Amino acid sequence: MGFSGKISSSFLRQSAVVQIVLVNAVVFVIVHIAALFGIGYVGEWLMLPQSWTEVMSTPWTLLTYMFAHFDFLHILGNMLCLYCFGIVALDLMTPRRFVATYIAGGLAGAAAYLFAAEFVPSPGLIGSSAAVMAVAAAAVLTKPDYHVRLWLFGLVKIKWIALFYVAFALLATRADASAVCAHAAHLGGILADRKSV
């Protein structure tokens, strides 16, 4: 088995949560390496544009935006929460359903963002926040008192982690008019797939 075959085999042995985290991490690294070599448009190529008209000419962005990040704290916060809620969600649903929930949340977030962008100018959308919020909502709505062990805090109910994550997502968004569109995407993700489990 060649090197690429070993990597592929190792990837497929991971849980669905780890697979999505790895895809996000690899895309993040590729975007930043490309930027170092003056190929900054790679990130823009993955970003969801601000209008349906532009999306029609770049339809792949409906999927790619939810696996891409520009900012380290953005990907770190999203992946930590995805891992935390994903472990719970995988106890409640199949891996296939888990991935479907992630993608449904991302697509719902994209639709909500594009609707809001019709009224408020925005530069485009990137990041997995909406998709992660769909996973978090699926876990919290089913098992709000489920405990996870956090390194510094011990056992914590996931409903409190979800509350912190939503607050983090809202506070981490730029404090300008375009933030309305980002918040719309987050809300779209939360409401995306409440019947997942």
Segments from the language model and where they lie:
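A detector for small-residue-rich transmembrane helices and their helix-helix packing motifs
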Residues: 1-196
